Amino acid sequence: MKDLFKLLKAQAKTEEFDAIKIALASPDMIRSWSFGEVKKPETINYRTFKPERDGLFCARIFGPVKDYECLCGKYKRLKHRGVICEKCGVEVTQTKVRRERMGHIELASPTAHIWFLKSLPSRIGLLLDMPLRDIERVLYFESYVVVEGGMTYLERNQILTEEQYLDALEEFGDEFDAKMGAEAIHHLLKNMDLEQECEQLREEIVDVSSETKRKKLTKRIKLLESFVHSGNKPEWMILNVLPVLPPDLRPLVPLDGGRFATSDLNDLYRRVINRNNRLKRLLDLSAPDIIVRNEKRMLQEAVDALLDNGRRGRVITSSNKRPLKSLADMIKGKQGRFRQNLLGKRVDYSGRSVITVGPYLRLHQCGLPKKMALELFKPFIYGKLEICGLATTIKAAKKMVEREEAVVWDVLDEVIREHPVMLNRAPTLHRLGIQAFEPVLVEGKAIQLHPLVCAAYNADFDGDQMAVHIPLTLEAQLEARALMMSTNNILSPANGEPIIVPSQDVVLGLYYMTRDRVNSKGEGMILTGPKEAEKIYHAGIAELHARVKVRITEYEKIDDNELVEKKQIIDTTIGRAILWMIVPKGLPFDLVNQVLGKKSISKMLNTCYRILGLKPTVIFADQIMYTGFAYAARSGSSVGIDDMVIPAHKAEIIDDAENEVAEIQEQFQSGLVTAGERYNKVIDIWAAANERVAKAMMDNLSTEVVLNCHGKEELQVSFNNIFMMSDSGARGSAAQIRQLAGMRGLMAKPDGSIIETPITANFREGLNVLQYFISTHGARKGLADTALKTANSGYLTRRLVDVAQDLVVTEEDCGTLSGIVMTPVIEGGDVKESLRERVLGRVTTENILQPGKTDILVKRNTLLNEQWCDILEEHSVDNIKVRSVVTCDADFGVCAYCYGRDLARGHLVNKGEAIGVIAAQSIGEPGTQLTMRTFHIGGAAFRAAAESSIQVKNHGILCLVNAKFVINSANKIVITSRNAELKISDEFGRTKESYKVPYGAIMAKGDGANIISGETIANWDPHTMPVITEVNGFIRFTDMIEGQTIIRQTDELTGLSSIVILDTAERTSSGKDLRPALKIVDANQQDILIPGTDMPAQYFLPGKTIVQLEDGTKITSGDTLARLPQETSGTKDITGGLPRVADLFEARIPKEPAILAEASGIISFGKDTKGKRRLVISSLHSNDSYEEMIPKWRQLNVFEGERVERGDVISDGPESPHDILRLRGVHAVTRYIINEVQDVYRLQGVRINDKHIEVIVRQMLRKATIINAGGSDLLEGEQVEYSRIKIINRQLKSEGRQEITYVRDLLGITKASLATESFISAASFQETTRVLTEASVAGKRDDLRGLKENVIVGRLIPAGTGYAYHQERARYSKHREEALDMQQITAADEASANLAELLNSSLTNHKH
């Protein structure tokens, strides 16, 4: 038995935990935490500063004020540890127990916990099924509630006013029982039979037809069940005992001058205790009811204020009108416990200083000021001094360091050798905001930073500051070196391109070095190699730009890392030959033999990394930087005012424009054009003029004519300094040069509209006062925008991180066969993103076959690297199905194959990689570069004329997709389908262009025809929508009665008459129910059927349609029967930039969204109501029909009798992602969100890999709603984690029971974060009170799966290097459980054996 007891004791002590559970505390539990009751509101004696007995700081309850010393001083020192002083009753122990010992207050009357009352939806209200208003009236003593109805007609939970109560008392006497206040509610909650109530509701819900009622019942069932399962009792939501926080967590600090600084909680507790004591006294005196009631109400209010001040009634303020901070305020918000102390902690061993350039550093180094290093590495120095025997004690070592003796510096050098430090620049928007470097000691007080890492930090040297952190433990140093060293972060995790890219001076230096100049000194020489080139350059025999022939030795890398040498004489320049000396072996000479701008340098580094790997790339990057700086200095580039050459034609262009404007002004005054047209035309004219000036200026700047060595004129690229800076990509853009030397052009007002008088001057000429004033308009808006943008972008990043934080790569391969189909992104005539860019680094889902053959080109589950992409391009594969995070089958996290390549490392992603956080950072980090504004269409900034034709840009073959068409009498193709697309593909079948073709477009060529570039192949009238017949025959009017449904109009100019259908609103009452239509009949007046269906060919005409044919006219298929004028959509604002990205990720439903067909079938219209028309879709295969009411002002894309597929657009508008998910499925919504988000980023030139957006989409699709619960105990209409449904379904399938059917839900990122399984993560994000209330009622358990929860409980995160630790812990705990089970079994066996022995022996003793 002893062993068993030992075992139990050992188990109670363990600190290891795998999950955290939150639940309601019962009164007994609160008493068990407590070390005594707080009876008095006093805190400490103001003279002696000793805590008062039984007060809020009482030493007897909470522990001693000084370590191992009782209050009266009878027991001091360690030897009396654990003694309780008989005089003052204080236990002799450490002071720190005052941080953990709690007290309690016995409340004289029960009080409702405000969180469960007022946090919506009110838990108490839902449980009792009473409105919150009524419960509040009971709690705050305004009305009675019946607790026992007895034999009367009064029911339980019925509310009675004072008068009704008195009447009932007269009538029934004491047959019934009604109470008020929290006691009443407590009584009701206590007497609830949860399980019976649950059964009853489950029976009720089956017969309920109304949606709202069912939702309400489902909510109640869920709440009741959560109480049953969690073991919480409903009456615990009413407090009888109030716990008191340990005093050291609500300190009271004496200030000088006899005042005290105190925590607000003390004030709040004091009010509660005062009111409680007063209430006790009143109850003892048996005071009149009304007084007691008032006191109880005051107590309730005091407890409310303590728990959550300001939740109900007015906020309780302190003496200086500041609201008191209650317990709820302590944990919520940015300054609350979660975000301030648990997720963001201050760290020791850190420093910060201004940064300056360290152009001589290596990529893995940073310059650390000596003063700083001495302070930061102090403990290491002390240790080293002691080990070396230079100091005898730590104290001596301290003295030596303070005196800064010479030997200390030597020791410091040794200590910092190969000890990496971490540099961080705020704001840390992505993981490259913290990198590790080896410190190099420098004089001065500024940290020196390597110029190439500035791009990753987004740092510049205009006064930026950076922080230094020291990794202390060996493991930390190891991680810093192996994972965070700047040399390991060459590629950006957002797009897999190099982020260590030279910029500014370096680019200018390399550009200058690789340019060629006609007729420069030394031209035409033939040199033996780069060494000689350098020699003659330094000797001044040849110039840097001289065109020469050089013998170049190239090395080509063959598969098994062998280098093959190849020598040849190449035409190049001296500069390029010199640059070739630093290029590592294995790269081709063409990389250098060109004019190097920023893009080509980036490409060169990328190639180097892919061919040669990490180490040569790092060395190469450093060399590029040194060389670039050296030659930028040599070039002597600087900007002078004469570099800004103003084009000669400028004045003439501006005069022309002014004349045109004057002409339009005249037309406007004589009333030929409207004000709007005049404004638009003026802006068009000026925009065109600006373009012409800019073109003239650039032509002038960019080239110059020079004489070559043969005395002939030759055009060469200019050596103008400003042009060189812009052309190389070092600084400045064409738009900025235009403002310096062209004209500033049109300016926008802060509201986005364009001022019609442009600034014709440029900065070189100088602006006059008016021009300057107009300039400031836009500039100020720019600054205001930037400030707003930063905050918004940061908030978006925070929401993204929160939704994706728990997504980690957890397995190698989930074995799924599904994936998403990737095609190149083509908009109109441009390939915006090639297939290669989209599939690089993804894993194939299925075997890819050679186009047109059955040979396998790429096997399934192949990671597509650069070589595979080359093969795919050779064979011109046009679409590929690749694995995606969205379709990954892993239950928790995702698998490596579905994610593909780790972009920052260039190989398949490792297990434990925190891909969620990386995705969130990659999307959020460029957020500050996006615009904030909403574009107004209007003005030259953004105006597209209504499209009316398609003109192709490339040669190729025409291909129609989803197109239905008829051939008209002129033998042209007329499109009759709604979502036809037209693609132009080259001879290999690769799509080059793609366009949408509207209904009624006339095509010049058919499917499969050859097209030459510049040809117009389709045109249509953008202002009307035609009605096109698909059959031949004669027209017959039906229900077209003049004056009732139609009127005739005659055009004044042409004299042609036409029939116009009246809108239903304009018709007389007799014409309201008539439905005008055109029927197509044959010569015998018999109906003609639409080909392929059994529907007669008749076309119902909506209001405002214009018909130009007469009754009985002969028509042929493809003719236009009628035209419906389309209002061109007014100037709708295009939401762009950051707000658009936020809208997409929040899955917001747009205003006036597109209406999509809910089912496939034939369209017809039912009976209209006042403002809406009834659209009916009848299924082709069954008798089902689907009805929908659509507002009349919505313009429909479909005619009666037309066939639609589920998910087709019926009325145009922005599509709602929820509709896309419901009608077209997960793949479609993924594609939609990816494309829309990418459009915004592409506009700003930011590249982000699709993977990252897919990761966020996966998290948005985490939940599903249950349609049929099958064999599980879930409820219909309940929203459940999708992974949970998958697991339950697998289980049900194996047991042969019915599986759950469900639909996937799309949640916005904020909602998804709050709906996560982990309540700790949700509570630390937003709405802390609501999340915690919900979690505690349900008795939720947090399994600590995500990263955030583990940071909060102070563990290593289950990602990266912590992943292995968590795997190991899981294995260990499983092992331990098994061992414990075994031990318990053996111990029990032993105990029973011993017992048997005992009994036997006692029996034998008796016998004797």
Curated annotation (Swiss-Prot):
Query: What keywords is this UniProt entry annotated with?
Result: DNA-directed RNA polymerase, Magnesium, Metal-binding, Nucleotidyltransferase, Transcription, Transferase, Zinc
**Species of the source:** Baumannia cicadellinicola subsp. Homalodisca coagulata
User: Which residues are Mg(2+)-binding?
Assistant: D460, D462, D464
Entry's Gene Ontology BP terms? DNA-templated transcription
What is this protein called in UniProt? DNA-directed RNA polymerase subunit beta'
Give any Gene Ontology cellular component: DNA-directed RNA polymerase complex
Task: Spell out the Gene3D superfamilies in the cross-references.
Answer: 1.10.132.30, 1.10.150.390, 1.10.1790.20, 1.10.40.90, 2.40.40.20, 2.40.50.100, RNA polymerase II, clamp domain, RNA polymerase Rpb1, domain 3
Q: Which NCBIfam families match?
A: rpoC_TIGR (TIGR02386)
Q: What InterPro entries does the annotation carry?
A: DNA-dir_RpoC_beta_prime (IPR045867), DNA-dir_RpoC_beta_prime_bact (IPR012754), RNA_pol_asu (IPR000722), RNA_pol_N (IPR006592), RNA_pol_Rpb1_1 (IPR007080), RNA_pol_Rpb1_3 (IPR007066), RNA_pol_Rpb1_3_sf (IPR042102), RNA_pol_Rpb1_4 (IPR007083)
Protein role? DNA-dependent RNA polymerase catalyzes the transcription of DNA into RNA using the four ribonucleoside triphosphates as substrates.
Instruction: Give me the residues that bind Zn(2+) 1, please.
Output: C70, C72, C85, C88
Q: Which cofactor does it need?
A: Mg(2+); Zn(2+)
**Family, per the entry?**
Belongs to the RNA polymerase beta' chain family.
Could you give a GO molecular-function term held by this entry?
A: zinc ion binding
How would you summarize the oligomeric state and partners of this protein?
The RNAP catalytic core consists of 2 alpha, 1 beta, 1 beta' and 1 omega subunit. When a sigma factor is associated with the core the holoenzyme is formed, which can initiate transcription.
Does this UniProt record's set of keywords contain Nucleotidyltransferase?
A: yes
EC no. given is 2.7.7.6
**Zinc keyword on record:** yes
Q: How is the cofactor bound?
A: Binds 1 Mg(2+) ion per subunit. Binds 2 Zn(2+) ions per subunit.
**Superkingdom field:** Bacteria
The UniProt catalytic activity note for this protein reads:
RNA(n) + a ribonucleoside 5'-triphosphate = RNA(n+1) + diphosphate
Residues binding Zn(2+) 2, per UniProt: C814, C888, C895, C898
